[in-house]
Amino acid sequence: MYADAVTTVGAALRVISAAHTPLQLDFTSYRSPFALTTPEEISRDAEPGRDPFDGYLTRTLVPRLRRSGVDAIGLSICFPGQMVPAYSFALKLKRAFPEAHLVAGGPAITQVLLRLHGPALRQALGAFDSAVVFEGEHTLLSLCRALDEGHTSARELACIPNLVLPDSSSGAGYLPGPPAVDLRGLPAPDFDGLPLDRYWSPQLLLPYDPTRGCYWGRCAFCHYGLTATGTARYRERAVETVVEHLGALSVRHGTRYFYLSQDSVAPKTLGRLADALAESGLDLRWGTDLRPEAQLGPELCARLRRGGAVACSLGVESASPRVLRLIDKGVTPAIVGKAVRNLAQAGIAAEIMCFTDFPTETFDEAMATLRFLEEQAPHIAAFIVGQFELTHGSRVAREPSHFGLRESWIVRGDALGTALFFAERRSSKRARERVRLEQALDRLASGWLLRSYPWAGSLSTAHTIFYYDRFGSGVFRDLSGQAHGQLLGTTPAKQTSRLDLAKLALAEENEAKIWHEITHVRRQISRQTYDRLAAQLPRMRYLRRA
């Protein structure tokens, strides 16, 4: 039944996307071809026929907010895939509540706004009255207190650190303040008011951050979280505070499941936390993300398991020694392999996160990563192999020549500059090698039942942790080869397609060529450019003749 539910929800999302074409919607992304490139495109994507959330917002959310007498509304934009709907929500909320103060915050909007200045920064605010950059607990509290006292103008609010506001002379700006807060002074997260009983989950799993930032902080590809470059400064809560918070949240919300949702946590600290949890008698179950350190020996892994650890996702990145050195990962494949085996032998699901195509990575080096995964397969609970993407605040973007890049660029016409493109000095892989790599990855993945987020079989997710806790850390290897689910309420049937699939495949290939021309050759994006390039292609009849 679970597989059937996954298939049915996936089909529903595809239907929603088709009804709002050219939108592509899933649980991690919300994409339309020209999204966020100009204020006009932002407004276009907010139109009712293009926004699947329009009915909910106008018929449910706005009346609910109106009944509450709201005078301040905040939108947290954590992930890039949330940017488009956030701007759409902002336009409609401002239209419905012109007197309310509308504020944005979160990692995704922070990393956009920090790169912009003056008029460009003002344009990026869109319909928002303000935006919080960096970690926002103190800034948001100061804003709410100021609004409560009747201070509503940008001039009156300009004294609040890290609050981006319109400015009549410069366009927009903010008073710089400390980017990171004192984690030890913060209370436990507050989930009151959220409809936790309506989440698609058989049980409740809550996120909790025992630390913030990264204690290593040197990986060249990384620009993550609420920071201008790299990663934020590492901070920890006291172990006794973490245990107290987790215990209180467990009782209040009736759950024993948590995800320790920090960027990284020092192994020594995690060991002390596991010991304290074991001694507390709380009997919690948790997962987290870790660096694959040499300290993850058999004794520490056994302590983690006794303290309730169910799964640990390891940021492995690559199994090529040269690529790891270039990244400045600080570990070797041998260290990673031992950490994986020690976790697995302790009964903890060891999940592996890798990626290919780091600048200058060769085909042989990418294949070394896949061979490593194959060798460690008996100990790996699940894995993902992504593809490198260049991010603005990473060391690769700041020092491109050191990493073999000829150049990097933002295409003209992209007002927010959300996409960063690059070219290597020398192409590291041929086209046919990329095909071979994808084929090898498909063969490797067939040894597990792997799914996309947020389903069981994806990494660092609630459903996956529940599966590990119930069926053991090898459950997704055991389920490999399981048939795909069926649409609920339907009968399987075969039908001849009305569409010419060969022509559809050719159309997809042509679409990719158009976007390569736009992003890598002309380096300018607009509907006019797209239309001119599309007009140069021969027209095709996609419906089969009767």
Residue ranges and their predicted role:
Residues M1-V70, S88, R95-P98, L114, ...:
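Conserved Radical SAM active-site core
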Residues R184-A349, R371:
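Radical SAM [4Fe-4S] cluster-binding motif and immediate context
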Residues L75-F79, L260-D263, L290, T356:
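Short glycine-centered, acidic/aromatic-flanked micro-motifs in structured strand/loop junctions
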Residues L75, A104, V133, Y224, ...:
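Conserved beta-strand positions
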Residues V70, F128, E236, S280-R285, ...:
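A structural motif corresponding to the C-terminal lobe/cap of the Radical SAM core domain
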Residues T152-A158, A172-L175, Y234, R256-F258, ...:
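Acidic/polar loop patches that form or flank catalytic/metal-binding clefts of enzymes
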Residues S32-P176:
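Glycine-rich beta-alpha loop elements in corrinoid/cobalamin-binding modules
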Residues M1-L23, T38, S68, A423-A546:
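Radical SAM enzyme core and accessory elements
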